[in-house]
């Protein structure tokens, strides 16, 4: 789920809509792993004046799912690029080649964990990639 990019300055609306969207997907697919990713930028932008607050809302959906025992992963978009954020985002908003590569690597880590552990007792619920 990648949801919070263009409509996230209204915190209450984002929290409610993100929660509802997650539950809609989960209801339709109760037995699959879901990867939740927050927006992959950390600086203020035209679309997002407080990205850390939006990430906290997205993370709360994830935490609620973990608490409920659901099969879910979280990718913190604010941590994706590290020191490379200036080259990963071509205009401080949109990922370029390096940004997409780092995003793909984070998702691949989730896929590798799913392939290796499935939803067995070895699954590390709550891990943040």
Located regions from the model:
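Alpha-helical cap/lid subdomain in secreted, periplasmic
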Residues: 1-129
């Amino acid at each position: 789920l990648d949801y919070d990019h263009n409509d996230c300055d209204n915190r209450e609306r984002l929290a409610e809509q993100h929660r509802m969207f997650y539950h809609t997907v989960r209801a339709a697919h109760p037995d699959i792993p879901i990867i939740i990713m927050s927006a992959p930028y950390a600086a203020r932008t035209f679309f997002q004046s407080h990205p850390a607050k939006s990430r906290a809302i997205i993370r709360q959906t994830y935490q609620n799912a973990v608490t409920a025992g659901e099969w879910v992963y979280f990718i913190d978009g604010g941590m994706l690029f590290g020191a490379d954020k200036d080259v990963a985002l071509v205009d401080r908003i949109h990922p370029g080649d390096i940004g997409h590569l780092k995003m793909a690597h984070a998702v691949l880590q989730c896929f590798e964990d799913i392939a290796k552990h499935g939803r067995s007792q070895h699954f590390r619920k709550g891990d943040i990639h």
